[in-house]
Amino acid sequence: MENNNEKFNVSVVLPIKSSNVIGFDDYFKKCIDSIKNQRVGINELVIVHTDETNLVEFLDSYDFESINVKRYVWTEEPSFALQVNHGVEKCESDWVSIFEIDDEYSNIWFKNVKKYVESYPEVNGFLPLVIDVDERGVFAGFTNEATFALNISSEMGYLNNETLHTYQNFQISGMVLRKEIFLDYGKIKPSFKLTFGYEFFLRLTYNSVKIMTIPKIGYKHTNMRTGGIFWNYKNGEDVLTENEVKFWIESAKKEYFFTSERDIKYQSQEV
């Protein structure tokens, strides 16, 4: 384990729906190892998981070593948004970061965030440059890099509302955000399918929350993992039609003015 006596006051929130997915054990080990190997340690890992028997037994027996782990059992219908929201509410740190079981932090991520927090105290959120890979680990692209594109971002390195109306490919997982900002501006809206992260970013930037991308690789994301939330929207039990995809994108652009959840439901746009 990395010698990380130095710590950053951040809670990592990890929602888990089920362990009955392909490659779960391997994914989980890699994601937890990426926390163990941080150059600067975290304050706590908050896991919000369902009461699935196999999952509970797996977590009960897992060796997290010196990571400060807090677990909360989610007994309602599984929901990425609601489980994340609950986890953030339980956090005991000034900063929070949303994590996924099929993802990994780079070992310098929280070290870099700590340095940037000290240098840019007016900034409330920090995005990593994300490497996207497929299930085989093959490079598929980058995410969050558009804040450095001159034709997309008007303020180099910063995410703003104007940029989001031009370009949507930004990711909330891996991001480090002040806990009070997450809670004060309404958390993640659970009624949103597909575009919950996009709407969240629109809402934050509309309310003048300053978000910066740190220009270093900070996160690796497994794109379209079989059984994952976005895979289900395309291939699984929650498949969205093209019209539904358009609806959720347009709804995000309309609903970010409202801090509170308004329980949006799909309405066909066909005439």
PLM ranges: what are they?
Residues 108-144:
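Conserved donor NDP-sugar-binding/catalytic core segment of glycosyltransferases
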Residues 30-42:
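Short, acidic, metal-binding catalytic loop of nucleotide-sugar glycosyltransferases
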Residues 43-52, 72-75:
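Short beta-strand/loop segment that forms part of the nucleotide-sugar
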Residues 145-167:
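Short, flexible, basic/aromatic active-site loop/helix in glycosyltransferases
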Residues 78, 138-144, 191-193, 206-247:
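Nucleotide-sugar-dependent glycosyltransferase catalytic core
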Residues 74-91:
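Glycine-rich, basic loop-to-helix element that forms the pyrophosphate-binding segment
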Residues 96:
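Short aromatic/hydrophobic "clamp" motif used to bind/position activated sugar donors
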Residues 193-200:
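Acidic donor-binding loop at a coil-to-helix junction in glycosyltransferase catalytic cores
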